[in-house]
Regions:
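A charged, aromatic-enriched C-terminal amphipathic alpha-helix characteristic of glycosyltransferases
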Residues: 399-406, 417-448
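Acidic donor-binding loop of glycosyltransferase active sites
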Residues: 215, 325, 341-358
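Conserved nucleotide-sugar donor-binding subdomain of glycosyltransferases
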Residues: 102-153, 199, 203
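N-terminal subdomain of nucleotide-sugar transferases
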Residues: 2-95, 216, 437-438, 455
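Membrane-proximal helix-turn-helix segments that form the acceptor-binding/catalytic region
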Residues: 43, 125, 140-143, 162-165, ...
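Conserved donor-binding/catalytic core segment of Leloir-type glycosyltransferases
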Residues: 24, 259-277, 283-287
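Nucleotide-activated donor-binding/catalytic signature segment of Leloir-type glycosyltransferases, i.e.
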Residues: 301-306, 310-338
């Protein structure tokens, strides 16, 4: 990948110290995983490495993704990790995921019910997350690595949130600062806006402890930050927002292409299809919009995985009107590195996300970077609208109804046929405010000052 090789030079930045600051980055989901949070984790590790840090990533064992998650991998992503990043995969127990009785320990084989009860009790009393078994290997390995070559900083990204607990434990043990990055919320559901745990759960006790000691607490949008300020006001001054973004080294710097009027319009949804998406409103709106001359023969192509696990595929596929002859096609999954070509082949993009005010979605940044019309299919006033404000090719309704969705499709179709170089340039300029370098840069600088102030 020449564009990646060119980006990942080995030169130190001007004015850098002789010894690079060393960061331990705890990111359970990291390439080759294809989980949605991987892209932010990958970008963070790469950005810090490019800024002159010595980056060590602790992530899950490869077999977790390949065996226990049924090969939920995108191996092309591994090629996009900066070669200066060191990746370590501490071992762990797969108790919660192991289904092969031949792999059970003697006690679990002979007393499965008792074993399950003890495991559940242990979680409720210690840490309510299956990934807890990752912590011992992380702490053991990190302590040994630290005494060989000192870490200056720990950054943990969640979910899962055992990474936060490990960061807090290591920070106290090694007496170094740590920051936590909330890609998702820990104790409340971003989609239903309800608490995930009872108030007396260990999860709240751990979250309070983590936020009490963290040097910085990062969120992907201000809605999430405000929710946590209300619950943990003592940490408010250390809470910041680092938005998601997009990667020019993956998507390339697009060029204006005049509308192709000799073929039907191609609308595209690029991303994982999940049960939370408002698919009924999307396809009902599409059916109505098809009565417009510009959309009578248009295509709506779905690119991406159906859910995150094998059991998600069948029920999600049933919700796609593939047999109605209305131009809806499921094109299958694609590697991250294939995204550039798919965006180039698409005339307008469909931004369909769950309707919660705390949801941004990383995909919206790539959509804007394409310079193509974007059709919003979600409730109004979600966090993503803060990002889309100012994007000149954004089409959305006042409500999440089939009628409003249809109007947005029609407006986007007209824009796709009429877009000119000037409007395209304004759209791309807006997107450039959200490159990973733009969003991660100020955070990296704050972390550098933090390290320099404690060294």
């Amino acid at each position: 990948m020449p564009y990646l090789e060119e980006r990942f030079s080995t030169a130190m930045p001007p004015g850098s110290r002789e010894r690079r600051p060393r960061v331990l980055y705890l990111a359970y989901y990291f390439p080759p995983s294809r989980a949605s949070g991987v892209f932010r984790a990958r970008a963070t590790a790469n950005h810090f490495a490019e800024a002159g840090w010595d980056v060590t990533v602790y992530t899950a064992p490869r077999e977790f993704f390949e065996t226990y998650l049924d090969d939920a991998c995108d191996r092309s992503l591994e090629d996009t990790v900066d070669p200066r990043v060191t990746t370590v995969r501490p071992p762990m127990s797969y108790y919660a995921w192991e289904k092969d009785i031949r792999q059970f320990g003697k006690f679990r084989r002979n007393f499965p019910t008792v074993s399950a009860s003890l495991y559940k009790l242990f979680q409720s009393k210690v840490f309510p997350e299956h990934y807890l078994t990752w912590i011992p290997g992380v702490i053991s390995s990190a302590v040994k690595a630290h005494f060989k070559q000192k870490f200056d900083l720990i950054i943990a990204t969640g979910n899962p949130f055992v990474s936060f607990a490990a960061a807090q434990a290591l920070g106290r043990l090694l007496k170094i600062p740590y920051a936590v990055d909330y890609r998702d919320s820990w104790t409340f559901n971003q989609f239903t806006e309800e608490l995930k745990f009872k108030e007396d759960s260990k999860a709240f006790e751990w979250e309070a402890k983590v936020l009490r000691d963290a040097s910085e607490v990062v969120f992907v949008n201000d809605g999430m930050r405000q929710w946590h300020i209300n619950r943990y006001p003592y940490a408010a001054e250390r809470m910041t927002v680092v938005p998601n973004g997009w990667e020019p080294e993956l998507l390339g710097e697009g060029e204006y292409a005049p509308p192709v009027e000799s073929r039907p319009l191609r609308f595209g949804y690029l991303g994982t299809v999940t049960s939370y998406l408002p698919l009924e409103e999307l396809f009902d709106g599409w059916r109505i919009a098809r009565s417009h001359p510009l959309l009578q023969d248009a295509e709506l192509n779905i690119h991406g995985h159906l859910g995150f696990f094998p059991g998600d595929v069948a029920p999600l596929k049933e919700r796609l009107p593939l047999d109605e002859n209305i131009g809806v096609h499921y094109r299958g999954a694609f590697d991250k590195t294939e995204g550039r070509e798919l965006y180039a082949q698409t005339d307008a993009l469909v931004f369909c996300v769950p309707g919660a005010r705390y949801v941004t979605s990383g995909k919206v940044f790539e959509y804007m970077a394409s310079g193509k019309p974007v059709v919003s299919v979600h409730k109004p006033h979600i966090a993503a609208t803060e990002v889309l404000e100012g994007y000149p090719l954004w089409f959305h309704g006042d409500e999440l109804t089939a009628e409003d969705v249809a109007k947005s499709f029609i407006a986007a179709a007209e824009a796709a046929r009429q877009v000119d170089p000037t409007r395209y340039a304004v759209a791309v300029k807006h997107a450039h405010s959200y490159t990973r370098a733009a969003t991660l840069g100020p955070w990296e600088q704050r972390m550098r000052k933090l390290v320099e102030g404690t060294s």
